[in-house]
UniProtKB/Swiss-Prot annotation:
Name of the protein: UPF0434 protein Shal_2504
InterPro entries, per the entry: Trm112-like
Organism per entry: Shewanella halifaxensis (strain HAW-EB4)
Family per similarity comment: Belongs to the UPF0434 family.
Pfam family name, one: Trm112p
Signal sequence coordinates: none
Any one of the GO CC terms: cytosol
Highest taxon of the lineage: Bacteria
Length: 57
């Protein structure tokens, strides 16, 4: 199942409530403000702080 990019208009980082960016290749949502990466599983974003990983560029 593919991630619906329209969700980017309504979802926010659970930590800072900021905008998220979509990384299609890695199937992740990225919060650059907090430098956190949230996984997308089967097209569903997992926006739980304890599931986030540090952003490594």
């Amino acid at each position: 199942m593919a991630f619906d990019k329209k969700l980017l208009e309504i979802v926010a980082c659970p930590v800072c409530k900021g905008k998220l960016e979509y990384n299609k290749e890695a199937q992740q949502l990225i919060c650059k403000a907090d430098r956190l990466v949230y996984p997308i599983n089967d097209g569903i974003p997992v926006l739980l702080e304890n599931k986030a990983e540090p952003l490594i560029e």
